[in-house]
């Protein structure tokens, strides 16, 4: 409720309560605080909690990767190099080579506007290296590169394929839907 009202003070108070931390866990409580500060644009508090979460070793590995993945791609979409850099550094520390690889390539496409990774990414797609969200991201990145090169036909095809891989609430869906609406109009 306090998140919907964008009441970061109440969210912080509830998330820091001992009972909340025991019932929901450290990760969920920290995530609520991070989200509240993000929504209320309290940059200093957001950065403090983000840095804490990036350093924290107490979260289970699946939660940690999910958090890193979601926020990393959120900041790629928004073009926020500062936070993407922080999170990419944490991703590299996971040791998960597939996760690291597609994250670094996504960074190169989204923030550095590279368009020379198509062949490499298509090899990964064809070798079935990725599935689910990760496959959707790779397909999206190939579409972006084709778009940078002015190849709208291939960009559209890859964007359609990316959409099929994403959950309807995935961070990329609004971008994909907007692209498809504009391309098909």
Regions found by a protein language model. Give the residues of each.
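Acidic, Ser/Thr-rich low-complexity segments on the non-lumenal side of membrane proteins
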Residues: 7-39
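"A position-specific structural signal for the A-helix of alpha-solenoid helical repeats
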Residues: 27-35, 66-74, 100-108, 134-144, ...
